Amino acid sequence: MYLYLVRHAQSANNALAEPGLHNPGRSSDPGLTERGQAQTEALRKRFELEREATPTRSVEVWSSPMRRCLLTSSAVGAGLGVRVRVRSDLHEHGGCFEGARGGEGAPIGHTGMTREEIEKEFPICDAPKDMENGWWDPIRGCESVVDAQTRVGKVVEWLWSKARAMHDGDEPRADVYVVAHGMFIDILLKTLFDSPRTTGKQSSLFCSQNACVHRLHFDIAPDGPCVGFQVFNDVTHLDEEIRSGGSVAGLDVAYTKEGSA
């Protein structure tokens, strides 16, 4: 199974002078900047060309339920000519909340978009029934790094189960596209490659630029499963002037201050 990890295009929070969960000016569920919109159009064109080159290839597109990812995944799905399926567990660390983590007062949690709201605003997307009332429990406020690592670990288990099912013929073979977030992708890759997963200062990071594409191969072999990187942080579809994100310092702060934009 081939897995394509796509980070969302530049969000309004990404463009803040000081992006992070500690910034009171952050939005709980931001949209995209003009640069981000240009990035999604570049993604759409890239995947449209890929579809034209391999018209018989089967693909699946999965998306985080956060607005910046839905805007990005809609372009990915349009380019590939398929519908987008939404999974609540693909959201970014922190969840859906307003206010600054570590500021005065506790963060105020929100439910996030409901199934009806998502499918009305993003007609190409299909949201599951368990999102009838949203995807985030407001009582949780802001998700911790430890909780995010546990959640992403279960996503990794899901990906391996899909790879095995495709290998065994229990599920149609397809290339899997997941549109998610910078810190989510870092945690996922660390889990896949058995890198140390800690809180606070990190010894290593997998940094993703906005609207980048990673490609991995999940191999189910008789002597055991193996996953390998084939493409890392590909942004060749983006003109230099519209590239953004992916700094080491930015992702490092996401751990040391518990949160990213």
Where are these regions (language model features)?
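An N-terminal RHG(E/S)-centered segment typical of histidine phosphatases
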Residues: 1-58, 74-81, 220-261
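Phosphate-coordination/substrate-recognition cap region in phosphate-metabolizing enzymes
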Residues: 41-128, 206
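Short acidic/His/Gly/Ser-rich catalytic and metal-binding motifs that mark active-site loops
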Residues: 11-18, 94-96, 128-130
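Short beta-strand scaffold positions
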Residues: 63-64, 150, 179-180
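Glycine-rich phosphate-binding loop signature in dinucleotide/nucleotide-binding domains
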Residues: 50-57, 159-175
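Short glycine/proline- and acidic residue-enriched helix-loop micro-motifs
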Residues: 101-103, 117-147, 256
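GST superfamily/GST-like fold recognition
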Residues: 182-186
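Acidic, low-complexity terminal tails and accessory targeting/binding regions
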Residues: 1-3, 92-120, 165-174, 190-261
